[in-house]
Each structure stands twice: as C-alpha cells, then as structure tokens.
UniProtKB/Swiss-Prot annotation:
Family stated for the protein in its record: Belongs to the eukaryotic ribosomal protein eL32 family.
Coiled-coil region: none
Gene Ontology molecular function: structural constituent of ribosome
First and last residue of the signal peptide: none
GO biological process, one term: translation
Cellular component per GO, a single term: cytosolic large ribosomal subunit
CDD domains in the record: Ribosomal_L32_L32e
Natural source organism: Sulfurisphaera tokodaii (strain DSM 16993 / JCM 10545 / NBRC 100140 / 7) (Sulfolobus tokodaii)
HAMAP family in the cross-refs: Ribosomal_eL32 (MF_00810)
Lineage of the species this protein comes from: Archaea, Thermoproteota, Thermoprotei, Sulfolobales, Sulfolobaceae
Gene: rpl32e
Keywords of this entry: Ribonucleoprotein, Ribosomal protein
Protein name (database record): Large ribosomal subunit protein eL32
Length: 131
C-alpha cells in the first residue's frame, strides 16, 4: 500500500513538471522553412541575436535551471525505471526488480525474438512499455 502511494506521488510530480516543461526551439525556426524542419535547440551566436542577449519578449535561452529534478529524471511517466532488454538473460535480471522497473525492448530486436520475450515477460508478471 505504501509503495502505491509513493508511486502515485511520483506520477503526480512528473505530470506537473512535464506540463510546465518548456520546448526550446531554435531562434527564427518559424520564419524559414528549412530551419522550421530543425526544431532542435541551437545556441545563438549572432552579435545582435536577442535570444543570446536574453531580451524580454523572446524565447528563453537554455540554462541549467530548467533541468528536471533528480528524483524524476529519466523515469517513465508511470514512475518506474525503464529497463532495456535485449535477451532472456536481461529479462531475468528485470524480474528480480519487478516492483521498480518497466521493461523496454530494444529497437534492434527482430519481431520473432520480441514476441518470444513479450510472452516470457508476461509469464514473469513484468510491466511492458513497448510490447
């Protein structure tokens, strides 16, 4: 019972923080088609760039203060730790920590092997993120 309350608190905290999370876009991403395709952050380096100068009314510049809290960093939205699996040996390791982890199958696994691992994980009672 206590574990569920703890996980629920973590889930609520994750939800609140991810709602507030700012999406850092490249300066002028909306003005040019080729830049608009690159919606990833690039450090502004121009001499008069308002983002670099951190002028009011422009998008925020990436800073260390925007980082998510350590206790929720890297967690799955369910509040569990993602555990990447490539083979049955990894599944056995995950089953030892099944209260804390959620299984994520590696993208390099083929369909046949993935189906076998999904079946095995269900027998072990593991939670699966992408099965």
């Amino acid at each position: 019972m206590n574990k569920q309350i703890n996980i629920r608190k973590i889930q609520e905290k994750i939800k609140k923080i991810r709602e507030k999370k700012i999406k850092f876009l490249r300066y002028d991403w909306d003005k040019f088609y080729r830049i608009g395709r690159q919606e990833t952050w690039r450090k502004p380096k121009g001499i008069d760039n308002p983002v670099r100068l951190e002028l009011k009314g422009y998008q925020p510049k990436v800073k260390i203060g925007f980082r998510s809290p350590r206790e929720i960093r890297g967690l799955h939205p369910s509040g569990l730790i993602p555990f990447y699996v490539n083979n049955k040996k990894d599944l056995e390791k995950a089953s030892q920590m099944k209260d804390k982890v959620i299984v994520v199958f590696s993208s390099t696994i083929g369909l046949k092997k993935k189906l076998e691992l999904v079946e095995e994980a269900k027998k072990m009672g593991l939670k699966i993120a992408n099965g």
